[in-house]
Amino acid sequence: MMRGLVRLYGLLWLGLLWFGLLQFGLLYLASISVADEFTERILFEEDTDGFKLYRIPGIVVTAKGTVLAYCEARKFTEADRGEIEIHLRRSTDSGQTWSPAVQVAHLGERLPRNPHMPEKKKSKNMGGPDEQTVNNPVAIVDRDGTVHLLYCVEYMRCFVIQSRDDGVTWTSPVEITRAFEPFREKIDWQVIATGPGHGIQLRSGRLVAPFWMTDYDGRLPLTHGVGVIYSDDSGNRWQAGELAIPRGGEPNIAELSDGSVIVTARNTDPRNRRMAAISPNGATDWSKPIFIDSLLEPGCMAGIVSHPGDGVQEHRWLLYCGPDTTDRAHQARRDVTIYASRDDGKTWPIRKRLHRGPSAYSDLAVLPNGDILCFYEQGVEQRHGDRGRPWAYRYLAVARFDLEWLLKPE
């Protein structure tokens, strides 16, 4: 009888132990699930690796699922011009780990400086005569596995390089500045700049890159605006589309559910709302630009991306990110917020703050499993720090989240 009781107690003890381990395992899995709804990692930090500042983020996911995060690496100053390189980090595990940063784009011949710049910047340190600005990287992912990276040099010449191994190696640069020349009929530009952010490939196979241009001398009535260039032969030849948003700047682009294309743009209008236009083919026949009442515009670059959703609904999700403020002072850029539309941008009923505090430029990408990546400029309040004011550019951070996180109330 004693032996039977011992065995019974032993079985009870094992049962309790198993039950406890099971409960612990379920709690652990639940905690992992909650934690993984939103994660964030710092990819670049100011005053590291010999560079003063990292700005102007862009992010894409390749056909094989590799994440490419790229930016401007500003060597000596925080300014938009000077010695600036394009740096890239790669992730082959959906953003959990990242390769070291490498310089890409324009590693060969150095080009002369652009003598034209805004009047307000002439008194600032924009670099010496031997420095070179490589600016505004814009990647486009091709379904055939190629990644096309467009960028500008000195805000006046445009080049493209290609990678067929998910950003490990790149071809030599090919200049495509001639594709921008037809726009001189409307804006006699002295400055061109792709994106920033990313471009897109349409269902038709067309590659589309948005850009902005400026004429500082006012030689024609229209002095600045947003247009697109495109390629219908896998990036071998680039040509001009049409002016999409007069008086717009720093555009982003996405394909809508019906195959049409939306471009939205930064602007200086006192309504402080994002401007948008739509084209049936991503290049021509742009609609008259409108202001999107739900999307605040403080004079800042923003990100946009099309999301397939559950694949069942007729309309895709359209996601947008930008600062949640209308204060146009650079030190006031803050509270980067994600907006979501289920009707191709007609309404934006869903919004959620991604970062509380100083934050600015941002870009969006979608992983193969539907999770969303936001690569953005993140800062600190620093009210009593070195600058004595909020600073939105200390880090470049990549946040990963899913639609479930986005739909939960703050």
Say what each PLM segment does:
Residues 35-410:
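Asp-box/BNR beta-propeller blade signature and adjacent active/binding-site loops
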